[in-house]
Amino acid sequence: VLEGRHLEAFARVIADFHQRVSVAGADHRYGDPVEVLKPAEENFPDLRRCLPDTASAGRILALQGWTRAGFSRWRNEFARRKQDGFVRECHGDLHLRNLAWVDDDPLVFDCLEFNPELRWIDVMSEVGFLVMDLQARGQAGLAARFLNHYLERTGDYAGLSVLPFYLVYRALVRAKVDGIRALQANADEHEKDACGRACHAYLALAERYTQPGRPRLIVTRGVSASGKTTVSDSLIASLGAIRIRSDVERKRLAGLSAESDARAAVDQGLYDSAGSYATYARLLDLAGQVLAAGFTVIVDAAFLQARQRQPFQALAAERGIAYTILEISAPEVVLRERIVSRARGASDADLAVLDHQLKSWQPLTLDESVYELRVDTSAESSLGKLMESLR
């Protein structure tokens, strides 16, 4: 059974693979905007041949119009992505049938070797293929988990801006492939029927990708070990949200990996006032990028000071979107037990940090309290109630 831990491992392997493969140079045509549009346009003649009925023709025409409008909208972004080194020699055929779990390790196999044009692509096109495949199979939660862990590993949140284009493209490729199979003379009637239904399902999925979502901005608030990351981890799957973690971005700003040990005395090292300011500024910038791409964003940080929260409330107001403050807590004895017992991870907090936070945190203002949802992570029913409140 495919589980979240499997997709997290595949995200790590694929992210690391993308980091080390060759990058398309400026003198290569691969990844140029016109090369991005070309394979997308090639889907439509075949789709019209596979689905000649009037109703399908109208849907295909609308999807082609969206593709062309999207290309015009993101043309400069496609060029920027290549300039910034995100067009690389990728796997090229990254879907579930080319992934395996062997001896408790992830294995990615059968890369696309015969056509370099389909292999030298934006890494986000490759990510979009697997995200689409998971969603098409009814695994939206696992798709969100994979996407989040890939982004957390690479920091490529800017790539979300072009992800909708690639999701539509990948869904239409699958629609075309199944449509062609349904027309093959040597296929039996059962296979033709199954492929025909799959073709229509992928077409419907592509249409859903073209519909703008209603993103919202969610920030966590709580001291170390209160369970912020555990809560946000659950919300990733249920909301299809993108999470940004202060523990990870703080270290990224310093050129460190998430697993690096950056422990220091309270308000020292990466956690001094300058480091804290830079981290929250980074979180605000990334949240804006994620929202602009049409995704709900969860900002996983302590947010113990009003001055840290206010810019995020202002961002939500500016964008005209829903804003939520998750007040995440647990009894102090539980907090201390968690600090002592938890394994090393992205967080560097110890008991001294917890003591400082408990003494210095600022309560929500009256203006902020209307956005508050409370979660006691020591109570089993609390998370379920939160899910209901956010639906």
Q: Where on the chain are the PLM-derived regions?
A:
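Conserved lysine of the Walker
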Residues: 228
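The conserved Walker
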Residues: 223-224
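Small-molecule kinase domains that catalyze NTP-dependent phosphoryl transfer to phosphate-bearing small molecules
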Residues: 341-387
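Conserved substrate/cofactor phosphate-moiety recognition/catalytic segment
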Residues: 234-295, 337
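Hydrophobic positions on the alpha1 helix immediately C-terminal to the Walker A/P-loop
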Residues: 231
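ATP-dependent phospho-/nucleotidyl transfer catalytic cores
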Residues: 1-96, 100-216
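Conserved phosphate-donor/acceptor-positioning beta-strand/loop module used by diverse small-molecule
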Residues: 319-339
